Each structure stands twice: as C-alpha cells, then as structure tokens.
C-alpha cells in the first residue's frame, strides 16, 4: 500500500539481523519485499539443517553445523554438500555456507545493515565516513562512480515506481541510503499523508495502515500513481503544484517523502558548461531535498533545491520573469510592443523573450532543453563550433536554413512530456562538441540514459542529412574555448568503425557501438562518404584520378548536397577556430571536420576513380588540422592530435584514464563498453579478460587442463580489433604498412625496413663494409664478428658514411616508384580499399591504381586486367639508360625492395680495383636496379602481381613523416577478410600486363607440400603443372633481389625461352648480357646465402595477400597429431623407411649415414617418431613438428640476397609449375645438373630452398627457379662432387622400384626410369658441344636450369646442397665477396635486428582477425605474421628476415645463422684437409658420412645458410684453377641449352661433399682434373637427362607437388 512511499527512511532489511540475536518479530507490510524470505527465516525460533534435519536454534549454529557436513564428505574439490557448487578454497566454501544458513554475521554499526563478509561491510562503512549530508550536493559522482553506485547502493532514482521494479536487494539497499540521510537530518520518519513523525520505520508502517483509503490520485486529472513520489512529480511538472504544508507554503525541503540529494544528476557532468542550466531545468522538474549542511541552494519562493548557486540564480530569474510577465499582461494593452527588429533578430537566433513564452513556464524551460537536445541529435554530425549558442538554440527559421524540415525542430508536447516525466532517466548525453549520444543502459547501471524509443520518436522525422550552412553563418567566436570541456560522459563507441559492428557482438553492445558520439543519431542512416579537400589536393587531383576519369569529381571532393562547399579558406578558418585544448577532448573534432556527400556523388567519384564498380569505401574522412593527414575515424584523429600535443596516445576518450600501453587501454575500454569478449562455452559466462574466464572454468566447471580450458573459452570478436586500430596512435603506426609498433622507438627502427637505402645505415664496419643503421649495432657486429679488434679500438673500425652524395644519384630514379616521396610538406591522401590511407606524391605523375582492381574479398584473385589496358597512361621519367623507352614502365622500381641489397653507389667505394672495373661494366646494367633497390616483381598464382607492400625506397622522405593508422573498412569487416590480417593494397604503381596464365599455383613449394601432406589436398595443386613454364618465366622478369646483372641475364634467358612473354620484357631484363658483367657481379656478390623456397616477406605482405592460397598459419594452427599420423613410425621403421621411402636416392644411403642420423636425433629413443615430410628431422611430438613445419614455409627464411655471383644457385625447382613444359624442352636441356639434383643429399636441397627464398621475394618459387645463376654453374665446375648417399627421411616420397643401369638410381615408375635413361643418353650428346658459345650459354642457362631443375625435383628427396665458392670467388675477389655479402646481409640484419628487439614479440594489430580462433602460438613475426611457440623460435626466424648471421667461422670468416651450422661447417675445414690428402676415395667417404649430418642438421632448422657452409672448403681444392672456370664457362656456351645444369655440378662436387652415386666418376677426379674437365663434362649421356625429363612428366601429381618443395634442384653431374 502506502508503505512504499515511506521506504524513504527504511534501513535495509538485512541490516536488522545480528549474528546470534534475533531481531524482534515483526509483521512485514504486504508490499515489503526486501528480504521477506530472510526475515521469515530469522523470525523462526528454530533452523533446520536441510541435510540431516537437525534443528538449530540460531542461524550461526546452523552455519556451523552445515559446514561440518562439508568436512564430513572429505572432498578436496571444495564443493557444497547442499547445492553441489564447487568453490576454489575451503574459506570460500565456508563463506558460501552463509547463503544456505541465511546468516549475515557482519553488521554495520551505523545503519545496521548486515553482510556476509567483513570486506563487504568495510566497503559499505566507507559511505559513512563522510557526513552524508555533505556528500552529494555539490559533487555528483562521476559516471563511473555512479555506475558503480548503482549496483551496490542506488540512491533514490526519480520515481518510486522504478524502485518497485528493481530487484529487492537493490531496493532495500537504496532505502537504507535514504534512511541515512534522513536520520542524520531529523532521525524521524514522516507520514506523507498527515506528516506525523515516527521514531522507527515499524511505527510508521503501522501508522500507514490507518490511511487505507488514501489513494495516490491526481485531483485534477484523476491519474492514479503507485507511489507518492510519482504523484508529487506529476503535480510539479504537469500542474505546477508543489506540496504545501498546512500553512500553504511550499513544503519540499522538510518533506521526507521527497528524495534527498542530487545524485540523479549524475547523468551529466558537473563540469559541463551547460550544467547550471541543465540542473536548473531538471531540479525544477524533479523535486529534490538539499541535504548538505553547508551548500544549501534553496529557492525562497518555491522551496526547490538546486545543486549549485548558478542553477539557483537561473531559477530565480524565472520568478522575476513571471512577475514581469504579469505586469506585462497588465500593461500589454497600453504599452507598444518591443522593437520588431529586435524581435526578428532574436527569432533569427532562435531566441525569444521569456515573457513572450506561454504561461506554462516550467514546461517551456524543459521545451528549450529538449529542443536544444533534439537539435544536437540532428546536427551531431555537422561541423560547427562546439557549444556555440547560435547553433545550439536554433529557431525553426534557422533550422530551415540548415536544410532541416521546419516541422522537426519545434518539439511537440508529447515529446516534452516524455522527457519531463522521466527526466533523463534514460537520457541524452550532451557532448561538449554539441553532439548528442544515446545509449540504453541496463537498469543495473547507475547512469540511466535515454530510452531509444523516445529518441527514435524524436529523431524520426530528421532528414537523412542536414548540411551545415557556410561557415560565415556560424558564430566565429570559439565560445567554448573559454571553458574546460567536460570529458565525454557517454562511453564512446570505443572508437570502433562507425558503420560496422561485428556480428558476434551481443545486441546491447551493438546498439552501444552504433550510437557513436556526435556522429549519427540512431534513426539516421550513416552519413555517406565525406571527402575533405586538402590544400594540396587541387594540385594533385589530376595525378590521383584515374586516367579515364574526369577531373571534376576528384577536384571537387568537398561535395555537399544542399549547400555550397566550404572554400579552403573557410575550412582553414574553421579548423583554426578550435582551440588547442579541444584536441584533448574526444568528440569535439568530429562536428567541425565532417562534410556530407550524397551517395550519388560518392558513386560518381568512385566511378570516376575506377572504371569498374568499386566496393564501398569508408563514409567519413577526418583531416588533422595540425598536419595534412586525413583519417577515416574520428577516434584515430583524436589519438593523432594527442600525438601533436604530446599527450599519451593511450588515453581513454571517455574518462581521464591514461594507459601505459594499448593492451591496458583496451582492457579499460571494456569497462565502458561492457564488452566481455571471452565467453565460457559451457554456461556462456562472459569475461572481460581471458584470465577471468579461465578462472571461471577452473572453479565452476572443474576444467583443470590447459587444453580443456582453451577448448571451452570462446573469444567473441566484437570490436576489440577495431578498437586497437582506432587507438593506434599515429606516433607508433607505420605510415607505409599500417603496422602498429606500440612504441615510437620501435617505429623508428621499423621505418628502416621501408627505406632500403644505404643512407639509412650511416655506420659502416671498416673491416667488412657492413652498414648499420645504429652505431650500437655496428659495435655489436664488430665485437662478435671481428674478434681481433680490441674494444678500445672499435671506434677506429666504424666508418660514418655521409649519404647526401648518394641522394643526388638516387633521387631521379626514385621518382618513379616512391609513393611517399613528398617534396611538399603536405601530402594529399587517398583512401584505398583496404582502409589504409596512403599518401601519394603530389608532384610526380603516378598512375592511380584502379580501386576496383583490388577485391574487397581477399579470397578472390587480384584482377590487374585494368593495368594492362592503361599502361600507356603511366607517366614515368625514363631514367634507365639501357632500358628501351617502351619498357620504361617496367622497372625494378615496381617490385618490392630487397632490404638487404647494398646500393651500388655505396659499394663502389669499397670494392677493390679489379672487381670495381668488372662491376662498372655490370653496373651499367644494374645501376638503376640498385638505385631503385630492385624489387622483384612477384606474380601471383594467376599471373597477377602479388600484393606488393608499399615499401619505402632509398630516397629521402622529403616531407614530414606522416603516420597513418590502419583503418578497417566496412566491407572488409563483413567478409572473410576478417580471417586474415588486414593488408595494405599495393601502392598505385604500374605493373606488367597479365601474362597468359590461367591457372593458379601455390605460392611456395613448401606450402604445396604442407597442403598436400597435412591437409591432404593434393587436388589443390595437381592440375597446375601445365601452365608453369610461361608463369615461371614471366614471373622471373623481376630483377633479382640481389640486384646483380647476372640475375637479370638469367631471367632474360628464361623469358626468351618462353615464347609467351613479350620480347620487350627480355630487353628490360637483359639489356646487355656480357660475360664481363657476369663475372663482375659474380665477384661482387660474394658469398650470399641462399634462402629457402619461400618468398621473403620483409615488407610484411602476407603469403595469402592475394587470397589465392591456403593460410599456412591457419592450417598449422588447427593441425593436430592425427594429421601427422602418416608420419608416425616406430624407431625400427624409421631407419628402414628413411632408406626406402625417402627419396629416389635413399637406397644409396649407407648404414653409417643412417646411424649418424639416428644418433643425432634428440628423440632417437622415443618409441614413436613423427618424421618431417620435407627433411630428415624426426620429432616425438606433433607440436614440435608443427613448429618445425614453419621452417619449411616462412619461418626461417634467410633474407639475404642469394649470391648470384656464383656460390648460390637459385635452387628452387620450378618443376611444380612446369612439369609438362620441361619435357617439351629440347632433350638436351635437362643437364647433369638435374642428375646432380636428383642425387644430391638433403642438405643440398635445404640450401637450395634457401637460395630461392631470397630471390623470390613475394614471388612464387618459379620466379627464382628461372633466375638460376649461371655463373654459379661455371664456378661449380671447378669443384668435385664427392659421392654421398643422402639421407632424406621424407615420408612423402615413396619407394622406388626401378633401378637405373648406369647410375643405379631407383625410381618408383618405369616411365620415370626410362626418362632417366634417356637423360644419360642426352648427356653424352651434350659433351660434344664446343666451348665457343659462352655468352649464349650464359644467357640461355638461366631459363633452362631452372626449368630443368624442376624436372627432377619431384623424385628427389630433400638435399642439403653444399655449394662452395670457386677460387674465382674465394680468392680472386676475396674480400669483396665478404664485403658485398655482409653488406647486403648486414643491411637486412641490422634493419631488422634492431627492430626485432622491440617488435618480435608484438603481434600485429590485425592479428585478432587473422584467425578465427585464438592461436596459441603467441609469438608473431612482425614481418610475415607467422606465429611461433617461443621467443627462441621467433628470434631464430627473424634472422631469416634480417639476414643476421651471428656465428662466424674463424677459418674462412663465413657467417652462419645457427650455431650448429657453424660447428658443422668447421668440421668441413677439417675434412677438407683429408679430402686433399686422400684423394677421391676419402673424399667420397667423408661426404657420405657428412651428408647424413648435414642433411639432418640443415633441414632441421630450415638451414638458414646451408650454402655458405662449404663454400670455402673447396676454395682450396679448386683454388688454383680459376682459368678452368673461365674456359669451362666458354665451353658451356655451346651447350647452354643442352647442359644448362651441368656446369654447376662440379662446383658442388669437391666442395660440398654432398654427393650422389651418379656422380661418382666425376667426383673421383682430383681437383687438378677439374680445369680440363670444362669440356669433358659435356660428354655425359644425354639419355640420362632425357630419362629424367620423362620421369618428371609421368610423375604422380602428389609426388610432383611434394618434390617441388622437397627437393629443390640439385646439381647433378653425370660422368
């Protein structure tokens, strides 16, 4: 009945019970629902145990008794014997038993409220520490505090009605709060009907029964109310009637039925400039008592209380105006009206005199506020001066000028009543930037905000867009700058993309995120694209627009639907009007900066920019007013502005919280958003952080193992990733690739990876010429690599290079490819599809990449067909002296740079005379390539260029460095692209026409292997062989990453062999193939380690960037032991199968080799082993194999350029791409090199894989396959291949059942055997070739070896090709090789090693989207996004990107990535002596034994530098025959097409000791025989090669796939 009205003074029921003494029995009133059940339990004279029926006299006894039941059970799981709930500890269980006994042993000494725990009581006691009368009047709690308040002790909300709807616990606690205030005031309970005073609530309740007929009904309109408070408010708001005492005076401040305090005003911030006005209107509508002893702002006229003096003054003015209005009514007949001009002026401002307002005074006040708020809602996305009064209180007249319908603006009475009856219970949040945000808050939260339905009703008639009048109509004085703006109250949308909400977000979150502050009113459609014109855009629009597009759309980016666009001056003025301090505030930027563009205009712009339909773009762009950057999110802009102002980038936009890092900020933001992304799959309990969810699973569901816990945690991707992106502070975000590096220092280090120029590495080691970006890195290098240097002399070994001289050389060529080279300080930004804002050069004509070419769905292949149509439109300065003009569009500049390549100009200073002369000859060809940091153009599987990351080139950045934050565009979020990291689209650069290739190919041999073996998807790849030849050749056109002319020549020959490719490509790649250039580069390049078959991803481009390939990352993340079951085998089977099921040469493996390998294996005694399908390593755990598998993809890539000079073959076979084509080549083309390839030990293959990896860049294997370095072949002929049986252990290769008569090799298929025999025959034919066509051989070799290499690759098992530097390299060039190598390696090494320190542990921001489930491998490579289990794995992997080789051989100064590689290499030095002494037999035996070791060790770590290990070994063996190399090279000219691979075999022979049966006779020749052998080697049976070709063609698709990755081309020599 009426007792609810009296709850004002109640103390919580649970406060009335003591621990052991029962409270006096009471008769609860019918509607007292507080703890009714609890009370009845307390009233009982006895308490019964639910388990054993024992009767206890007190609750405490019952508690102690039921606790004994728990100990009786003796369980260790701490589960409740009554309800079975499992708790974490015995103490928690004891505390839990209070729930069943009902005892609340801890009681507040002030208010009597009782609690189950001491901590809860003490927390409660804090509310009594201050005088409650002084707590609330002047300092409404902050939104966060108020939110916390609501759950624990909700102060009286506006309506008793609301309290009745709340849960009993909350209501009771709330009542207790009222009681506190009242009792301190007058310790009495008042009857709201007769105003009698009572000393206890029970007396009051009894008294209320004497008023049974007192119905709460309005006397005027007969509306009935459930609570007295509701009636009071109704009378005050509707009828302007205030409660009055018997004398007729307003009776508010002493009326106990009126709520005390102003806590309800917590919906807005008291620091808000409009707070006095808001509080005045609100307190006039909602009667409140002032409970402060000191700050009592009470109106003497109407007895209303206000929280602050200013609100009271505003209120008293209304009384004065009322009086004035009464006088005015009396005088209205005689007095003339005010000046009509003045009235018109006031009306134009949306103002009128209050005396002209209708008598319903308070309602009109509310009406003003409502109108103001509605205008805010309507104009929230309009640029304006935040807080400018002219725009805030727009009259209908002004609103009409703004394009809004007249009818929308004047609020109707219904709307006013909606708000006045429930003032702001679910109200607006008025933002400091004049925008309004609406978010429904659940009843439990303290800040009750606007009901969505109300707002929808009010905003329903709003036009989709209300455009701003020209700025001149807006007041130009920054009114709000006088005030310190309040921080935004409403949880902002966490700076998530406004137009996209993750589908998995729970519904409340969706509405919360969509209602973005100051952006979009809930009922309005998202505003269309807004493009802000930059001061520079006008000059660059012609360059930015598509050739076919008209310039008008691009030059008029400031399209507005209904008003004239702002001029640049107006925009500048508008931005300048904002004070700096506003930049601190989250929201005030949005309204000023945004401009509307209709969807039609947007389509016109897009249609103009791209000839085909483009996917949807971001709707809004936000320019920075301090620099020229443009952002797609206001949150990103705010974060960016903080960086201008030196404020922490990780500052909460909602409150004052400043996080130390982004992760802490994200966790904090969840407290505002309510987001709980970690969900228990069993009971759907959500957690804000994973640890909470894990604890929940352990405690509640008894999940103890990590596997069970992980399995039952679901991560709901709502907006965390977008939050991350939005909070990317531009001072930590890479502008070129969008990567957020978390720290500015890491960003600086990272930026070096984009500027591949030597000038970024000013510190050079005088010993080896390696350049470093930081001096400390150079010192570290000297300490580790040059041990003879004393520490005190280190400074003398560091050369500081001045780069200014080189810039002049590089500038001109760089103009062609430098997307980011800005001569002007301001760079206009276009927004590409993938959401990264890329700057385009404002002065260099550059073809804009048609946006339509880049599908939003990354699963689609890229479509570059537009490129081939518009190539003529590309305007590029033609700087290349030797490239013909038609080919000027095809430059090295179009390819991803190889960061480890030293610049030619830089190297010129260091190269001694002889090499220098030769280099100059070649530098004519390669000069531009160096200047442009040659980027091999990788073609994707369908022949399209792989998505090349926009990487900086060696030019200086002339403008200020603009850091752009990664943006997620809506289309991206909606599609499968969420599953992989967001990648920048390739920069607008012209690319080659699409080659005539129709089939997609796997990007890497290793990927093909893994897909076929792990995912059992051979069908994915089996049909792709036919197209390989044209593809491989065309993709090889990219300049070799090592930047030498040799690579170009070999590429050219490959292209020439391919009739499908335009001849001009050949010209571009091979302008002047000359032996001199070849040798010069050979010498110059020195010892480069090859890398594995996978592309180097230093620029961060993901392998799946084009969407064409399976994600190895995802695949491995989901593999389990079962997937590897084919590779499980017992220890016995292991030795047996490794011989039989290995590669075709496995039968030759000697028992000693197997034994060695068995000893080597860490898990050799393990009962079951998992053999890596791609190398001989064996693992006891599937997880170890999974981790190791990455070494066959991206993990261990050596990022140094391969030594094109001769040490390193481009060893990847392109066979997987050309299985059919190879057989169609002239029979002679598959030379002994293929035999060698077929027979080389696994270590060889590993090395070859690595060699490729480097050259490929983001290309497929075929690219580097075609780029086989021919000089290498010529040098290899100086070496013996010691015979060795290779140990492969690859279970992917099956048994061979057919043996070759000539070499004893076995094959699985008869057809393969017959082809193999033909190869022997063909080899004989080849030997008859003369040596006079050397240059031709050199050119043609490039294509043939790579194609031939692929031919045999399928049968061969992994081989560790030990390639040794010829004397020509080791001795003739000597130091040059080291220098060139270390420089190219060093650049990559230092660039990434410095970056690695801060980056390698930091997962990319977008990683959250890259996998559907959380990947347990927490260490993520920042370059290629590969994941690793441990930091050690990642560190080792990073060396593949950086080129770091921390281990150095003291004998030959070779450097190695892995320590065990160095150890193995040092063994070679010992064995080389024996090789020289004992001749061919001992050589053979040693290499046999070492083959097992090397193949195992090298492949086990993906052999980051297998090739380098033996190079020096054989320098001695062949050291005295440099002329032999030259003569052999000449002799190869004639045999180039027939013996393309043959030449390389000898160099591998003596040197590598990784040999094969077929090469025995050759191997047995002493080193001295090698020189004459230049021609003799040509006499090998060509039938063997023919045989190999046939075998290759008939190979099964699976074998072909596996072989292509497993056995990269081995150099076979057939005697």
Curated annotation (Swiss-Prot):
Pfam families: zf-C2H2, zf-C2H2_6. InterPro entries: RREB1 (IPR052795), Znf_C2H2_sf (IPR036236), Znf_C2H2_type (IPR013087). It is found in: Nucleus. Its main location: nucleus. Residues 145-154, 1082-1095, 1464-1477 have a biased composition (Basic residues). Residues 15-28, 535-549, 1123-1132 have a biased composition (Polar residues). The keyword Nucleus applies. GO terms for biological process: regulation of transcription by RNA polymerase II. One of its GO terms (cellular component) is nucleus. Keywords: DNA-binding, Metal-binding, Nucleus, Repeat, Transcription, Transcription regulation, Zinc, Zinc-finger. SUPFAM superfamilies: beta-beta-alpha zinc fingers (SSF57667). Residues 1242-1262 have a biased composition (Acidic residues). Residues 1-44, 127-169, 511-556, 1025-1044, 1058-1104, 1123-1162, 1214-1269, 1313-1418, 1464-1585 are annotated as: Disordered. One of its GO terms (molecular function) is RNA polymerase II cis-regulatory region sequence-specific DNA binding. Gene3D superfamilies: Classic Zinc Finger (3.30.160.60). Changing residue 837 to S: In strain: Leghorn. Residues 1026-1036 have a biased composition (Low complexity). The keyword Zinc applies. It comes from the Eukaryota. A zinc finger (C2H2-type) spans 47-69, 78-100, 106-128, 189-211, 216-239, 297-319, 622-644, 650-672, 732-754, 763-788, 1170-1192, 1298-1320, 1419-1441, 1447-1469. Residues 1321-1339, 1388-1414, 1478-1493, 1566-1580 have a biased composition (Basic and acidic residues). Belongs to the krueppel C2H2-type zinc-finger protein family. Transcription factor that binds specifically to the RAS-responsive elements (RRE) of gene promoters. This is Ras-responsive element-binding protein 1. The lineage of its organism: Eukaryota, Metazoa, Chordata, Craniata, Vertebrata. The gene is RREB1.
């Amino acid at each position: 009945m009426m007792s609810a009205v009296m709850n004002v003074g109640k103390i919580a029921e649970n406060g009335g019970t003591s621990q052991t003494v029962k409270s006096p029995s009471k008769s609860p009133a019918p509607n007292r629902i507080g703890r009714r059940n609890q009370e009845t339990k307390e009233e009982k004279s006895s308490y019964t145990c639910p388990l054993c029926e024992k009767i206890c006299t007190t609750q405490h006894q019952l508690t102690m008794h039921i606790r004994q039941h728990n100990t009786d059970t003796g369980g260790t799981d701490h589960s409740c014997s009554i309800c079975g709930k499992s708790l974490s500890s015995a103490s928690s269980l004891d505390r839990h038993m209070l729930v069943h006994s009902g005892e609340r042993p801890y009681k507040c000494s002030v208010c009597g409220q009782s609690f189950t725990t001491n901590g809860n009581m003490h927390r409660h006691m804090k509310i009594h520490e201050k005088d409650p009368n002084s707590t609330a009047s002047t300092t409404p709690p902050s939104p966060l505090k108020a939110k916390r308040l609501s759950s624990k002790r909700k102060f009286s909300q506006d309506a008793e009605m609301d309290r009745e709807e709340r849960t009993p616990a909350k209501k009771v606690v709330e009542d207790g709060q009222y009681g506190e205030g009242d009792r301190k005031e007058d310790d009495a309970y008042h009857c709201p009907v007769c105003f009698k005073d009572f000393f206890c609530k029970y007396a009051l309740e009894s008294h209320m029964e004497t008023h049974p007929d007192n119905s709460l009904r309005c006397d005027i309109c007969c509306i009935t109310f459930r609570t007295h408070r509701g009636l009071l408010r109704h009378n005050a708001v509707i009828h302007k009637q205030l409660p009055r005492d018997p004398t007729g005076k307003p009776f508010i401040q002493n009326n106990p039925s009126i709520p005390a305090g102003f806590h309800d005003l917590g919906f807005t911030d008291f620091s808000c400039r409009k707070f006095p006005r808001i509080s005045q209107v609100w307190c006039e509508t909602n009667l409140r008592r002032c409970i402060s002893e000191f700050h009592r702002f009470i109106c003497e006229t109407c007895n209303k209380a206000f929280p602050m003096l200013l609100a009271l003054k505003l209120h008293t003015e209304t009384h004065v105006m009322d009086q004035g209005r009464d006088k005015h009514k009396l005088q209205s007949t005689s007095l003339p009206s005010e000046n009509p001009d003045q009235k018109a002026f006031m009306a134009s401002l949306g103002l009128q005199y209050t005396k002209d307002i209708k008598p319903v005074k308070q309602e009109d006040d509310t009406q003003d506020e409502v109108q103001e708020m509605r205008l805010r809602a309507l104009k929230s996305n309009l640029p304006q001066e935040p807080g400018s009064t002219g725009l805030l209180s727009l009259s209908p007249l002004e609103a009409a000028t703004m394009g809004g319908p007249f009818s929308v603006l004047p609020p109707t009475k219904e709307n006013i009543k909606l708000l006045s009856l429930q003032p702001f219970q679910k109200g607006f949040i008025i933002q400091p930037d004049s925008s309004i945000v609406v978010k429904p808050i659940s009843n439990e939260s303290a800040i009750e905000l606007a009901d969505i339905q109300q707002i929808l009703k009010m905003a329903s008639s709003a036009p989709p867009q209300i455009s701003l009048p020209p700025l001149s109509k807006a007041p130009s004085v920054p009114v709000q700058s006088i005030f310190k703006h309040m921080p935004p109250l409403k949880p902002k949308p966490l700076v998530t993309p406004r137009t996209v909400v993750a589908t998995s977000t729970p519904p409340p979150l969706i509405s919360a995120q969509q209602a973005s502050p100051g952006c979009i009113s809930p009922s309005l459609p998202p505003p269309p694209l807004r493009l802000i014109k930059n001061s520079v855009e006008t000059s660059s629009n012609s360059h930015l627009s598509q050739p076919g597009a008209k310039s008008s759309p691009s030059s008029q980016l400031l399209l507005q639907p209904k008003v004239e666009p702002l001029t640049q001056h107006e925009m500048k003025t508008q931005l300048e009007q904002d004070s700096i301090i506003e930049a601190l505030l989250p929201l005030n930027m949005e309204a000023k900066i945004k401009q509307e563009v209709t969807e039609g205009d947007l389509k016109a712009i897009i249609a103009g920019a791209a000839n085909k339909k483009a996917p949807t773009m971001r709707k809004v762009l936000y320019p920075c007013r301090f620099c020229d950057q443009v952002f797609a999110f206001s949150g990103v802009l705010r974060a960016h502005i903080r960086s201008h102002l030196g404020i922490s980038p990780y500052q909460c936009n909602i409150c004052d919280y400043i996080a130390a890092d982004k992760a802490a900020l994200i966790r904090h933001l969840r407290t505002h958003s309510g987001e709980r992304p970690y969900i228990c799959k069993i009971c759907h309990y959500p957690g804000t952080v994973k640890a909470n969810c894990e604890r929940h699973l352990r405690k509640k569901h008894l999940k103890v193992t990590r596997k069970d816990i992980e399995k039952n945690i679901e991560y709901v991707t709502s907006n965390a990733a977008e939050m991350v992106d939005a909070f990317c502070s531009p001072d930590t975000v890479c502008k070129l690739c969008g990567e957020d590096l978390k720290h500015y220092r890491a960003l600086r280090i990272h930026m070096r990876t984009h500027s591949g120029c030597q000038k970024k590495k000013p510190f050079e080691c005088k010993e080896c010429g390696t350049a470093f970006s930081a001096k400390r890195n150079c010192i570290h290098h000297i300490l580790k690599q040059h041990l003879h240097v004393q520490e005190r002399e280190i400074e003398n070994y560091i050369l500081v290079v001045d780069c200014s001289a080189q810039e002049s050389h590089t500038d001109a060529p760089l103009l062609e490819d430098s997307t980011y080279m800005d001569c002007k300080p301001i760079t206009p930004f276009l927004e590409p599809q993938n959401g990264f804002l890329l700057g385009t050069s404002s002065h260099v004509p550059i073809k804009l990449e048609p946006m339509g070419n880049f599908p939003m769905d990354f699963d689609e292949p890229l479509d570059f067909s537009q490129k081939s149509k518009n190539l003529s439109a590309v305007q590029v300065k033609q700087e290349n002296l030797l490239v013909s003009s038609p080919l000027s569009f095809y430059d090295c500049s179009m390819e991803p740079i190889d960061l480890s390549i030293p610049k030619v100009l830089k190297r010129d200073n260091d190269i001694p005379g002889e090499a220098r002369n030769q280099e100059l000859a070649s530098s004519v060809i390669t000069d531009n390539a160096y200047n442009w940091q040659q980027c091999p153009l990788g073609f994707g599987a369908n022949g399209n260029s792989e998505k090349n990351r926009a990487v900086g080139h060696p030019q200086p950045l002339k403008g200020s460095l603009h850091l752009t934050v990664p943006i997620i565009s809506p289309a991206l979020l909606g599609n499968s692209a969420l599953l992989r990291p967001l990648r920048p689209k390739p920069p607008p650069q012209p690319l080659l026409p699409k080659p005539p290739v129709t089939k997609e190919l796997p990007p890497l041999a290793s990927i093909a292997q893994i897909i076929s073996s792990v995912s059992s998807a051979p069908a994915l790849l089996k049909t792709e062989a036919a197209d390989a030849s044209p593809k491989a050749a065309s993709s090889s056109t990219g300049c070799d990453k090592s930047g030498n002319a040799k690579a170009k020549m070999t590429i050219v020959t490959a292209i020439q062999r391919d009739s499908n490719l335009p001849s001009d490509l050949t010209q571009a790649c091979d302008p002047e193939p000359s032996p001199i250039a070849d040798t010069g580069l050979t010498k110059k390049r020195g010892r480069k380690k090859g890398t594995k078959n996978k592309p180097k991803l230093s620029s961060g481009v993901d392998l799946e960037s084009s969407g064409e390939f399976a994600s190895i990352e995802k695949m491995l993340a989901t593999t389990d032991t079962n997937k590897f079951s084919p590779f499980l085998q017992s220890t016995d089977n292991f030795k047996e199968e490794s011989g039989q099921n290995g590669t075709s040469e496995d039968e030759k493996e000697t028992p000693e080799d197997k034994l060695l390998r068995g000893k080597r294996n860490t898990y050799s005694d393990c009962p079951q082993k998992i053999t890596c399908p791609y190398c001989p390593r064996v693992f006891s755990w599937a997880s170890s194999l999974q981790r190791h598998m990455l070494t066959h993809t991206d993990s261990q890539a050596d990022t140094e350029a391969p030594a094109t000079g001769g040490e390193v073959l481009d060893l990847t076979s392109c066979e997987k791409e050309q299985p059919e084509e190879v057989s169609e080549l002239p029979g002679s083309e598959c030379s002994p090199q293929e035999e060698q390839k077929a027979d080389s030990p696994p270590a060889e293959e590993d090395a070859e894989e690595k060699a490729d990896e480097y050259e490929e860049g983001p290309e497929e294997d075929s690219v580097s396959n075609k780029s086989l370095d021919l000089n290498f072949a010529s040098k290899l002929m100086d070496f013996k291949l010691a015979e060795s049986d290779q140990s492969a252990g690859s279970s992917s290769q099956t048994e061979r059942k057919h043996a070759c008569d000539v070499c004893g090799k076995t094959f699985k298929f008869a057809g393969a055997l017959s082809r193999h025999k033909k190869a022997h025959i063909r080899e004989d034919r080849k030997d008859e070739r003369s040596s006079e066509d050397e240059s031709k051989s050199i050119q043609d070799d490039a294509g043939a070896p790579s194609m031939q290499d692929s031919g045999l690759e399928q049968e061969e098992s992994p081989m560790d090709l030990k390639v040794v530097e010829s004397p020509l390299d080791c001795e003739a060039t000597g130091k040059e090789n080291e220098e060139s190598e270390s420089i190219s390696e060093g650049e990559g090494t230092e660039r990434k090693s410095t970056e690695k320190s801060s980056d390698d542990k930091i997962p990319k921001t977008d990683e959250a989207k890259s996998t559907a489930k959380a990947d347990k491998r927490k260490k993520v490579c920042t370059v290629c996004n590969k994941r690793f289990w441990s930091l050690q794995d990642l560190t080792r992997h990073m060396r593949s990107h950086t080129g770091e080789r921390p281990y150095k051989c003291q004998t030959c100064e070779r450097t190695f990535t892995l320590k065990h590689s160095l150890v193995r290499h040092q063994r070679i030095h010992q064995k080389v002596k024996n090789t020289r002494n004992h001749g061919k037999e001992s050589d053979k035996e040693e290499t046999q034994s070492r083959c097992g070791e090397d193949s195992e060790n090298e492949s086990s770590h993906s052999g980051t530098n297998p090739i380098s290990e033996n190079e020096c070994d054989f320098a001695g063996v062949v050291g005295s025959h440099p002329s032999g190399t030259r003569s052999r090279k000449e002799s190869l000219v004639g045999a180039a097409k027939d013996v393309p691979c043959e030449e390389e075999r000898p160099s591998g022979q003596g040197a590598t000791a990784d040999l094969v049966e077929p090469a025995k006779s050759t191997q047995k020749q002493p080193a001295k025989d090698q020189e004459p052998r230049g021609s003799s080697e040509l006499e090998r049976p060509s039938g063997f090669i023919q045989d190999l070709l046939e075998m290759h063609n008939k190979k099964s698709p699976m074998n072909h796939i596996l072989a292509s990755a497993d056995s990269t081309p081995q150099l076979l020599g057939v005697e």
